[in-house]
Amino acid sequence: MVATEPSGTGAPRFEKKGILRFVEDSETVLARMDRSTLEYFSSLSKYREAYGPYLDRIGMPSGKYLWQLPESGESFSFEARSLDIFALHDPYFQYEIVKLPEGFCIRTGINVPQFDLPGGARQVQILAGDFVLTASECVQLGILVGKGQG
């Protein structure tokens, strides 16, 4: 935010020019993913065949954003995930996706640039109908287990 002094008031005024510029959902963006890259999987085996069994997360398990973790174990960079600077020291988790119940699906796509970061990571979300689940909910439902525990 930029502080300026409105004429004659002597008090600073803040313009809405904050450093964090979130990319909102639009015709081209959904949940920070490029809509042209979105894929939906109702079959776990087809998802795993395309992208492997592992996911990871930067942030508490109460969050809904996961990322593909290549089988090599080399995770996407912070910059490719286009996360805001406040997530820099958040905890890191690795998961294996082991089941996908009937009526659930996996949505995946490529992160768009934001916060002056390039994007490009493959983001993954688990949906129950139209409802996006948190990592914690996925663990409780047996969809995800800690990597190496499955």
Spans of model-derived segments:
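Catalytic toxin/effector domains delivered as secreted proteins or via bacterial secretion systems
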Residues: 5-150
